[in-house]
A protein has these predicted regions:
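Active-site hotspot residues in diverse enzymes, especially metal/ion-binding acidic/histidine motifs
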Residues: 1-409
Length: 409
């Protein structure tokens, strides 16, 4: 009998947005074999064992390595993730994100252990508040200032590259396929992390498709806010947690002293455009930051928001902010399973990586914004997700983290 972990079969199916019936049909269509949906249900519920033949058919149909189904993994409570749900959020979307985050977390921690790298940065817990109830803006600003120090940022001034700052501190930043990458599924949140997880390396997942550079920067800062502010249970509502993370993101990207010297009640909308260009923050987020600090009145905030809406800037603001691309996980994979060709290019032995991590190559490729596979040099090509049209940004070598940049054990 094959050693199958029933939970892993369910995880793979939900990550791929397949019902038991759809998986059964996929097996019949691609493998010319029959595994009824009822049998898949019994396998997932541990009522029957999965034969080696059936496991091979399932793995081949899903294009997953056999090792994936044999691995043990701790279940992740969906409530531990910061993914923001709304009334319109499909349960299938939530399940896919939870499943992919579990896959990613397990892969990251295996590579981290393989390289002997340190896991969770101690400063996150050191800064994390423990008192019950929501924090006020001043308290969050103070914590954000201390976080900037830990990220090796100046106390004032724009953040040159939010992604690089996070990676230098040992926080992995990774695009996730399940977060709205398919047009069939409407994303309701652009970032996700798990602040309650104390084991392993912290991970910030984000959606990369059709999201502007300024929104990506804010999303990553927002998720850092969750990691720091909500590492301990503080009896907050979801809305209170979101509000705190929003305030934290604004404070990281534009410190109070900078905001006070830049924005006032008389700042015109055209001036906000120029401020966006210099700070890499959306105009809408700048208005909210100014309001939170009391730099503009409620009436002025309302007026600015009406002007933004009238100009159609809710959907597309003026000024293009460069998209930041993560590098740390890519370089970790290169060091563990291949070689680092350049700060932005890595070649891996895809067979070894997939077998060791139990993750399809297409996910490793997506999580790293692109990997080279050694097998392709001899004409054996790995399956990848379709290109989403994202344009890679040039990154100077001296701005790139390497696995050595993160503290070792």
């Amino acid at each position: 009998m094959a050693s199958l972990n029933p939970g892993r079969l369910m995880m793979a199916r939900t990550v791929e947005h397949l019902s038991q019936r759809q998986l059964s049909e996929l097996i019949e269509r691609t493998q010319h074999a029959q595994i009824p949906a009822a049998k898949i249900s019994r396998i997932e519920n541990g009522l029957v064992e999965c034969s080696a033949t059936d496991l091979n058919k399932i793995a081949a149909a899903l294009d997953y390595p056999i090792e994936f189904f044999n691995m043990m993994s701790e279940d992740l409570n969906p409530l531990d993730l910061t993914y923001r749900r709304t009334a319109k959020t499909r349960i299938s979307e939530v399940n896919a994100i939870v499943g992919e985050y579990q896959m990613l977390d397990a892969a990251v921690n295996k590579v981290t252990n393989k390289l002997g790298m340190a896991h969770r940065p101690s400063w996150i817990d050191a800064l994390a508040p423990r008192q019950s109830g929501p924090l006020d803006t001043l308290d969050i600003d103070r914590i954000a200032q201390r976080a900037r120090e830990q990220l090796r940022l100046e106390s004032k001034g724009a953040v040159p590259n939010m992604t690089r700052a996070l990676e230098r501190s040992g926080i992995l930043v990774v695009p996730m396929r399940s977060m709205g990458e398919s047009s069939e599924y409407k994303q309701t949140s652009e970032g996700v992390t798990a602040p309650a997880l104390k084991k392993g390396s912290p991970i910030i997942g984000y959606i990369r498709r059709q999201v502007t550079g300024d929104r990506m920067r804010f999303t990553k800062a927002h998720e850092l806010g969750h990691l720091v502010l909500h590492a301990h249970h503080r009896e907050l509502t979801k809305k209170q947690m979101e509000d705190e993370a929003h305030t934290f993101a604004g404070a990281i990207l534009m410190p109070r002293e900078d905001a006070e010297s830049t924005i006032s009640e008389t700042t015109m909308l055209s001036e906000f455009v120029a401020i966006k260009a210099g700070w890499g923050i959306s105009i809408s987020a700048l208005v909210m930051r100014a309001s939170a600090l009391g730099l503009i009145s409620a009436d002025r905030k309302r007026s600015l928001q009406m002007q933004i809406s009238a100009r159609g800037w809710r959907k597309m603001e003026p000024v293009t902010v460069d998209v930041e691309h993560p590098l740390l996980f890519k370089q970790m994979l290169g060091k563990a399973y291949g070689r680092i060709d350049s700060p932005t290019e890595v070649t891996v032995d895809s067979f070894d990586a997939v077998k060791d991590l139990g993750v399809p190559f297409r996910y490793l490729d997506f999580w790293t914004d692109g990997l080279k596979a050694e097998s392709e040099q001899v004409g054996v090509y790995e399956r990848r997700f379709p290109d989403d049209g994202d344009t890679q940004m040039m990154v100077m070598p001296n701005d790139c983290p390497t696995p050595q940049d993160v503290s070792m054990k």
